[in-house]
Amino acid sequence: MTTMLLLLVVAALANGQLTILPHEESQICFLQPDNPGFDFDGNFTNIFRDYASVKISSFTYKAQDADIVEILNVDRDRSCTILAIYIADSTLDFNTFLQSENECVKYAASKKHYIKLPRDREYFALAKNLSFCPLNDDLIGIYCDTQLETTYFSVARSSNYDVTDIPEFTELGYVFHSNDHFYICERKSEGNWIDYQLFYQNDAPLGTVSQRVNWGNVWSNVKTVAQMVYKILDIFFGKRNIEPRA
């Protein structure tokens, strides 16, 4: 988070000491699809920077063939005081990745990957057209041939990246295959790792592997990016007390 040159001076009159604390600038981050949206340049951002010491940053993500892990795996999100995401495609499951701590490993396309998934942990895949072959105690495929990916069982079959739970029923592991890169993720714990608000152009999804959805930061039927911008500013500055309607 950027530290401004402006310093707050706090005087402790009782003992005559003087403490100087740095004034930290808040940052509101907006993430929107790469198709034309809201113009964040110019006087609009200057208003809040000059008047309220708030930095407004805008970023875009690839709307087609969107990889949510790749979108969120950017250092910018860690410096945001609050992150607002505009989602035109409701199939993009941002909730799953923002509402819990997940550890994801990326695997290359068009290769067979042997992966062990302990049964006492919870795993899910972010993939499209992913298949797998579970192994028995002799490391032989269970009703599938590890050498022939055409005999594998389908985990995900979609033209977009989807979140799918993986049944952890064998200790010996699985062989995975996909023609596209994919992720195997372990859910480590429940809880937001960033203060965020989701704005869906249409109806909001429930979240594929989330145990529960925090409807307090999910908004639906937000037709324009501009509506998101003014709503998140309203939330940030606390001018009104209006509950989201998901």
From Swiss-Prot:
<dbReference type="GO" id="GO:0016020">
    <property type="term" value="C:membrane"/>
</dbReference>
<comment type="similarity">
    <text>Belongs to the rotavirus VP7 family.</text>
</comment>
<comment type="subunit">
    <text>Homotrimer; disulfide-linked. 2 Ca(2+) ions bound at each subunit interface in the trimer hold the trimer together. Interacts with the intermediate capsid protein VP6. Interacts with the outer capsid protein VP5*.</text>
</comment>
<keyword id="KW-1038">Host endoplasmic reticulum</keyword>
<keyword id="KW-1152">Outer capsid protein</keyword>
<dbReference type="GO" id="GO:0044166">
    <property type="term" value="C:host cell endoplasmic reticulum lumen"/>
</dbReference>
<keyword id="KW-1146">T=13 icosahedral capsid protein</keyword>
<dbReference type="GO" id="GO:0039621">
    <property type="term" value="C:T=13 icosahedral viral capsid"/>
</dbReference>
<dbReference type="GO" id="GO:0046872">
    <property type="term" value="F:metal ion binding"/>
</dbReference>
<dbReference type="InterPro" id="IPR001963">
    <property type="entry name" value="VP7"/>
</dbReference>
<dbReference type="InterPro" id="IPR008818">
    <property type="entry name" value="Rotavirus_VP7"/>
</dbReference>
<dbReference type="GO" id="GO:0039624">
    <property type="term" value="C:viral outer capsid"/>
</dbReference>
<protein>
    <recommendedName>
        <fullName>Outer capsid glycoprotein VP7</fullName>
    </recommendedName>
</protein>
<feature type="signal peptide">
    <location>
        <begin position="1"/>
        <end position="16"/>
    </location>
</feature>
<keyword id="KW-0325">Glycoprotein</keyword>
<keyword id="KW-0945">Host-virus interaction</keyword>
<keyword id="KW-0167">Capsid protein</keyword>
<comment type="function">
    <text>Calcium-binding protein that interacts with rotavirus cell receptors once the initial attachment by VP4 has been achieved. Rotavirus attachment and entry into the host cell probably involves multiple sequential contacts between the outer capsid proteins VP4 and VP7, and the cell receptors. Following entry into the host cell, low intracellular or intravesicular Ca(2+) concentration probably causes the calcium-stabilized VP7 trimers to dissociate from the virion. This step is probably necessary for the membrane-disrupting entry step and the release of VP4, which is locked onto the virion by VP7.</text>
</comment>
<keyword id="KW-0946">Virion</keyword>
<keyword id="KW-0479">Metal-binding</keyword>
<keyword id="KW-0106">Calcium</keyword>
<keyword id="KW-1015">Disulfide bond</keyword>
<dbReference type="Pfam" id="PF05868">
    <property type="entry name" value="Rotavirus_VP7"/>
</dbReference>
<keyword id="KW-0732">Signal</keyword>
